[in-house]
């Protein structure tokens, strides 16, 4: 609501619409009973981008939509621009049969409770090992601090313990790493001793200095 208030004032100040793009593929994957707000109800000039790849657990499938609400300023022109960009930029469509199947289950979700279960298993365990990690309110990623300033070197070292981590530098946050927990809980349980061994290797390095 605060952001909507600021954008509304700025629209009046600059004399033209300011569009807010709400990227929402994770809107169903929220924890502790939280419900994500529907942004167009809060701010008129909102464009919503959505993908079914997360809610239906279809990684890699490009199935979704861009919503331009009729209430948005110049909505007809914005819609035409979005449709034109889709045709001109070039991309590979999902097979038509798959599109038809998805349309029949787009109001459903996969079992999303596994993500919250994995998160609640990982976060306290990693903290106890010495990792600094904020608990997310949804989705299926953690973004802890790496155990050394060089997150690239840290991620490379993690491979020695069969851990595949994504350096935070690729997301504009050096000194961190991204960890996905959209896997079976058993895999999380098997990974915990490896994270412990990785943390212990840094402690041993300090002892030997």
Locate each region found by the language model.
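PLP-dependent class I/II
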Residues: 1-206
């Amino acid at each position: 609501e605060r952001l909507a208030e600021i954008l509304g004032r700025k629209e009046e100040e600059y004399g033209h619409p300011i569009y807010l793009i709400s990227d929402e593929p994770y809107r169903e994957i929220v924890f502790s009973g939280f419900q994500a707000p529907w942004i167009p109800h809060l701010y008129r000039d909102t464009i919503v981008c959505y993908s079914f790849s997360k809610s239906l657990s279809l990684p890699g499938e490009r199935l979704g939509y861009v919503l331009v609400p009729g209430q948005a300023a110049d909505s007809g022109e914005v819609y035409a621009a979005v449709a034109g960009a889709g045709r001109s930029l070039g991309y590979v469509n999902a097979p038509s049969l798959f599109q038809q199947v998805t349309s029949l289950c787009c109001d459903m979700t996969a079992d999303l409770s596994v993500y919250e279960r994995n998160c609640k298993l990982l976060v306290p365990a990693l903290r106890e090992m010495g990792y600094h990690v904020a608990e997310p309110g949804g989705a299926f990623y953690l973004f802890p601090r790496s155990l050394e300033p060089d997150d690239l070197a840290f991620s490379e070292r993690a491979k020695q313990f069969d851990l595949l981590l994504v350096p935070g530098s690729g997301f504009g946050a050096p000194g961190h790493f991204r960890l996905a927990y959209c896997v079976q809980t058993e895999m999380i349980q098997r990974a915990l001793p490896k994270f412990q061994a990785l943390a212990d290797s840094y402690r041993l390095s300090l002892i030997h200095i």
